[in-house]
Amino acid sequence: MAKHLFTSESVSEGHPDKIADQISDAVLDAILAQDPKARVACETYVKTGMVLVGGEVTTSAWVDIEELTRKTVREIGYIHSDMGFDADSCAVLNAIGKQSPDINQGVDRADPKEQGAGDQGLMFGYASNETDILMPAPITYAHALVKRQSEVRKNGTLPWLRPDAKSQVTFAYEDNKIVGIDAIVLSTQHSPDIAQADLIEGVMETIIKPVLPAQWLNKDTKYFINPTGRFVIGGPMGDCGLTGRKIIVDTYGGMARHGGGAFSGKDPSKVDRSAAYAARYVAKNIVAAGLADRCEIQVSYAIGVAEPTSISVETFGTGKVSEEVLIKLVRQHFDLRPYGLTEMLNLARPIYQATAAYGHFGRSEFPWEATDKAEALRADAAL
């Protein structure tokens, strides 16, 4: 019986890197709402008392970057200077310029179906049947913990919580099946007047126990709640934040490979984002069709070229048909050219700010989580 442990982490919406991601995607959404064909690459840097928004944008839209930034920070919960960051008093610097015409000529085409990829690169998508949302369990429950932290902070259940938080969950497996949770780490920013014992009890009873399935917890499960003992200084005052620095949190928690490209602040012509979403869509439909228990898709592109330079499938020995058959099915049922996948998933619209915290995958509100191709895939696989 093969035993192993696997760990994934997540961070809350108030983590500095996630503040940056949410601002970048708020800008993207505001532009796409006015101009669905806009080209946007928006990067954000946050530190004590300041936000710098930069990047390259080609659009007919006008958006108020300063107001968008303040609104986003306010909604996250940084509204007092004693937190080291205040939506209403922080400086907002705008350093956005225009996209290079050299990139435009490689992407734009008279026939939109032949739209070239906005850059070269490789992207991965993954799905696993170990949870009902066809996501790996470690990242799923790591997200659930910090999402719960945000809920009980915002609704006043635990009023001493502050926006910055991190979680980490270690699952125990036997023969690749979950047998329990080995360790849980949850660190949450808090007001200075809460006693450590009260914090630990509140986090355990209000966040951890309602979120993690009791059958996976046992007497040997280890809990680390604010293990340094104090977490008052957090958010951008504790660490600077940058767009695109939480790419494993954003995806599969390390359970699948990653091509290296970040998502937030990028319009759908950037295959770093759109093709990673399409690859998840493909992998999830293959698993939903029962063609594999686990599936990882890789696609790659050349700048200015519409057709992917490669498509590959890995099922880790769980495939019910050969990987050659799966690749043929993928090519038959999914258009993975940049324009095709944007149309297939209806990506040219303002849906991205919601992706920028608590993971881009495993959330039913997003179109790449649909399993509408599963039945046709299963039929054509002739299982």
UniProtKB/Swiss-Prot annotation:
It is found in: Cytoplasm. Pfam families: S-AdoMet_synt_C, S-AdoMet_synt_M, S-AdoMet_synt_N. Pathway: Amino-acid biosynthesis; S-adenosyl-L-methionine biosynthesis; S-adenosyl-L-methionine from L-methionine: step 1/1. Keywords: ATP-binding, Cytoplasm, Magnesium, Metal-binding, Nucleotide-binding, One-carbon metabolism, Potassium, Transferase. Its EC number is 2.5.1.6. Residues 99-109 are annotated as: Flexible loop. Homotetramer; dimer of dimers. GO terms for biological process: one-carbon metabolic process; S-adenosylmethionine biosynthetic process. GO terms for molecular function: ATP binding; magnesium ion binding; methionine adenosyltransferase activity. K(+) binds at E43. Catalyzes the formation of S-adenosylmethionine (AdoMet) from methionine and ATP. The overall synthetic reaction is composed of two sequential steps, AdoMet formation and the subsequent tripolyphosphate hydrolysis which occurs prior to release of AdoMet from the enzyme. Binds 2 divalent ions per subunit. Binds 1 potassium ion per subunit. It catalyses: L-methionine + ATP + H2O = S-adenosyl-L-methionine + phosphate + diphosphate. GO terms for cellular component: cytosol. Mg(2+) binds at D17. ATP binds at H15, D164, A165, K166, R230, F231, D239, R245, K246, A262, K266. The keyword Protein transport does not apply. This is S-adenosylmethionine synthase.
